[in-house]
Amino acid sequence: VSGIPTVGYSLEHPLGLIPGTGRDFLAQLLYGSRISFLVALFTTMTALTIGLFVGIIGGYFRGRIDNYLGRTTDFLLAFPAFFMIVALSEPMVRRIEGTGIAQGNAARILFLIFFLSFFGWPGFSRLIRSQVLSIREREYVTAAQAMGASRTRIILKELLPNLWAPVIVVASLSLPGYLAAEAVYSYLGIGVQPPASTWGILLSNATRYVTVMPSFFLIAAGSLVIVVLAFNLFGDALRDALDPRADR
């Protein structure tokens, strides 16, 4: 296979050089993680904010509002989000570029954050709603209602402070999922494009040399697996710390 650099592993290049380009693999791995984490972090924050708002409204007010929001949530959860993102990637990126909001890879990053958040918030909403339905029946909420506290005050003073623990836990468990999703879409050519670097692009390049230089693919894939696993373990530990009754 042509394009494989002759310089191997060394103190100067601990993970070697990228085939075809001769770039330092460790530097590209670290640099590419910035975009992957950027997409994952902003997607988690956006989806969580929308899900928190919808879940609180539906769980607290119930009735027709909850029924309408619940049907919308069920529809989006059943929707084939992956195929929709694949199908809309090119036309939507061109539309974003046409509006002047962002250009090139910035437009692709914005597209991924928007659509991953759009299809991601229903999962957060369902969890928050179930928590709100439980909290609103507790004595301190009933006491606040009996004292004439407004709905806004009850939501801000009684509900939100008791939702932070599950919110933090679900956010820590969701972030690695979006990190992996960004890698998958970049691998498929939907996300950020070369010469920029993300873990998905590194994996895509590595598959071309997997038979002659398997270490390139194994290091790229292993790095993603380790980071995702680390966040999942952190989320599990955080859940056990914030809610010891979860294992009972």
Where are the regions a protein language model picked out?
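Gly/Trp-centered helix-boundary motif
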Residues: 1-48, 52, 56-57, 78, ...
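Generic hydrophobic transmembrane alpha-helix motif, especially the helices
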Residues: 12-19, 42, 46-50, 59-60, ...
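Amphipathic cytosolic juxtamembrane alpha-helices at the membrane-cytosol interface
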Residues: 23-38, 42, 62-70, 133-137, ...
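Membrane-spanning helices that line or support transport/gating and their immediate boundary helices
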Residues: 52, 56, 60, 64-71, ...
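Transmembrane helix-loop junction
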Residues: 56-60, 90-94, 130, 134, ...
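Short, conserved catalytic or interaction motifs in soluble domains
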Residues: 62-63, 77, 81, 94, ...
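Glycine-rich helix-loop "coupling/hinge" segments at transmembrane-helix boundaries
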Residues: 88-92, 104, 116, 173-223, ...
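Alpha-helical transmembrane segments
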Residues: 117, 121, 125, 174, ...
